[in-house]
Swiss-Prot record:
This is Dynactin subunit 2. The modification Phosphoserine is found at S83, S321. One of its GO terms (biological process) is protein localization to centrosome. The modification N-acetylalanine is found at A2. Pfam families: Dynamitin. It is a peripheral membrane protein. Residues 18-27 have a biased composition (Acidic residues). The lineage of its organism: Eukaryota, Metazoa, Chordata, Craniata, Vertebrata. The modification Phosphotyrosine is found at Y6, Y86. It is found in: Cytoplasm, Cytoskeleton, Microtubule organizing center, Centrosome; Membrane. Residues 99-132, 215-245 form a coiled coil. Residues 1-27 are annotated as: Disordered. GO terms for molecular function: identical protein binding; protein kinase binding; spectrin binding. The keyword Phosphoprotein applies.
């Protein structure tokens, strides 16, 4: 029996099964929930494409030659993996930089310095204090230093005598080539053809390879032609006037191009000659007379047609007058005949239903007659069997009584 102190508490359901409710999901469904997306601007959402990453690092190997990740006791640092855009050596490694590594390091440092100077130029305000290097002057010096670095890189590729202006590298290379040719000609003239057959070839000779790209030339030529056609189309669209349907002078002046429009205008202007105008005026006078005759004939024809239609309408009304008097009686008779037709249709449906019912009853009687005949035959057979059984029982009783 329950404790009586809980008998009169509010909110207790009596004579009902106990139900324990909770807002939590079952244990099997607790892990299945949608992750709450972070909408903060401080969180950077990075979309990673696994297929692209796999294609980028496919068939790549990590070189472990010269690497040492073991612990150390001395002051010498061990060589581990180095990562970055450029391979730059740290201090104290005891490894000498190659010229390529030194050039990349200097170029990277100049780029970092340029970025810092640009930040200073945007943030620092004008001040009255005098400085030795202002951000503007420092930026100019950095640009010159970067140009020198790039020029030194080109000198390493093209030779120590390469003096190329970065503003126009193609023109500078052409000038350099002409200077080399002039120097070669002067050296040949000074030698005077005294070289012997067994003498080695002159090492100061310069060999150039000219690479022509006809596809690039064709592409640039096609681009220029397309640009010219585009400008010509814009010019034609600007000069060409839109055709006005209300203006008879502008009819037929919508040419496909500017030349066609000019030819059409020239043909129209040539049609304004005095001799041509006299011929046109004579033709217009004859045409005007014919038009007036056609208008008069058309008016007479229209009047005759109107009179004919009026006579036909009057005859139709005369024929309709006796029919109109008998129309109400005809409508009443048609309504009565409609009701008779509906009753006849219902009677026909009843006859059809009665015929169908009679056929069903006849078929049922045939089935019942067949069943009755079968039952009578079965009863006769059963009665004969019962009589035979009683006769055999009487015979046995008589034998037993004797």
């Amino acid at each position: 029996m329950a404790d009586p102190k809980y008998a009169d508490l509010p909110g207790i359901a009596r004579n009902e099964p106990d139900v324990y409710e909770t807002s939590d999901l079952p244990e099997d469904d607790q892990a299945e929930f949608d992750a709450e997306e972070l909408s903060s601007t401080s969180v950077e959402h990075i979309i990673v494409n696994p297929n692209a990453a796999y294609d980028k690092f496919k068939d790549k190997r990590v070189g472990t030659k010269g690497l040492d990740f073991s612990d150390r006791i001395g002051k010498t640092k061990r060589t581990g993996y180095e990562s970055g855009d450029y391979e730059m050596l740290g201090e104290g490694l005891g490894v000498k930089e190659t010229p390529q590594q030194k050039y990349q390091r200097l170029l990277h440092e100049v780029q970092e310095l340029t970025t810092e100077v640009e930040k200073i130029k945007t943030t620092v305000k004008e001040s009255a204090t005098e400085e030795k290097l202002t951000p503007v002057v420092l930026a100019k010096q950095l640009a010159a230093l970067k140009q020198q670095l790039v020029a030194s890189h080109l000198e390493k590729l093209l030779g120590p005598d390469a003096a190329i202006n970065l503003a126009d590298p193609d023109g500078a290379l052409a000038k350099r080539l002409l200077l080399q040719l002039e120097a070669t000609k002067s050296s040949k003239g000074s030698s005077g053809g005294k070289a012997t057959a067994g003498a080695p070839p002159d090492s100061s000779l310069v060999t150039y390879e000219l690479h022509s790209r006809p596809e690039q030339d064709k592409f640039s030529q096609a681009a220029k032609v397309a640009e010219l056609e585009k400008r010509l189309t814009e010019l034609e669209a600007t000069v060409r006037c839109d055709q006005d349907a209300q203006n008879p002078l502008s009819a037929g002046l919508q040419g496909a191009c500017l030349m066609e429009t000019v030819e059409l205008l020239q043909a129209k202007v040539s049609a304004l000659d005095l001799a041509v105008l006299d011929q046109v005026e004579a033709r217009l006078q004859s045409v005007l007379g014919k038009v007036n005759e056609i208008a008069k004939h058309k008016a007479s024809v229209e009047d005759a047609d109107t009179q004919n239609k009026v006579h036909q309408l009057y005859e139709t009304i005369q024929r309709w007058s006796p029919v109109a008097s008998t129309l109400p009686e005809l409508v009443q008779r048609l309504v009565t005949i409609k009701q008779l037709h509906e009753q006849a249709m219902q009677f026909g449906q009843l006859l059809t239903h009665l015929d169908t019912t009679q056929q069903m009853m006849a078929s049922s009687l045939k089935d019942n007659t067949a069943l009755l005949t079968q039952v009578q035959t079965t009863m006769r057979e059963n009665l004969a069997t019962v009589e035979g059984n009683f006769a055999s029982i009487d015979a046995r009783m008589k034998r037993l009584g004797k």
